Amino acid sequence: VQKGRKAMLQETWATVTYGLYDNRKIRRLKKFPPALVENRMLFETNDDFTDNGRALFDYLIEKGYNKKYEIVWLVHEPSKYKEYQFENVKFVQNFKKGSTIRRAEAYKYALTSKYIFYTQAFNWIGMSRRNQLFIDLWHGCGYKANKNGRKVFFDYCLVPGDIFIKTKMEFFGCTSKKLLSFGYPRYDMMLKGSERADEYKKKLLKETDSEKLILWMPTYRHASSERLNEETLNNEFNIPIIDDADKLLELNKFCKENHILI
């Protein structure tokens, strides 16, 4: 009950302060936007500091691009990321505490950044500035329809390869010129590998008498968090293909016989 009351008070306070301060400031920022900062990059990911945005950020830091560019992250709680505050790197609170209401400061950085990188959609800004570049790093490339027909705004969007261009043209309703088949930064990170990952893989294969490791990350799945649910699956295990225990045992038998670990 106390948690519920606290959340309700936070939401109420966020709404009040938005009406008194943020809303007016946002309107003014949009009407009289400050000058673009030519060397400012802005990052936002669906879950803070993750996905393709995080992988690209790590690469930029590794190569020293933060010496030339200011890199700003929009996150829920900036204090969580103190260890990543390298030279010219800043973490800015995106939402008012305990709410889904964006702060005026988030708009300020969105309206003044020359380059904006994101992984979902950035429609909330409601406008784009001349000479701003909106680059959608996106978060996956499954063959699924754009069910709600929403428009995702960008100047360019990454896809893993040429084979995805046609399907993403249909999904986003854009031309092929806007789709860059450079691959995803997180794929580069995964393929680069690490010594720890190699050691763990060897350990798993040895323990299970396996020769091959398959990492299965189904898009259509049921999750404990409603926000992460992609589809409602009506089967025993809430994952695709494996509808019941018999199919699971059949797959397990096949894997054992062929020394495969999933």
Per-region residue spans from a language model:
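Membrane-proximal basic amphipathic "stem/tether" segments
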Residues: 1-38
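Short intrinsically disordered, low-complexity coil segments enriched in acidic
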Residues: 2-4, 150-154, 218, 236-237
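Generic detector of solvent-exposed, compositionally biased contiguous segments
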Residues: 14, 19-22, 185-194
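Short, flexible helical or helix-coil boundary motifs
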Residues: 20-24, 64, 258
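A short, compositionally biased domain-edge/stem linker segment
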Residues: 22-32, 121-122, 198-203
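Active-site and donor-binding regions of nucleotide-sugar-utilizing enzymes
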Residues: 37-193
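Conserved catalytic-core segment of nucleotide-activated headgroup transferases in glycan assembly
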Residues: 51-59, 188-262
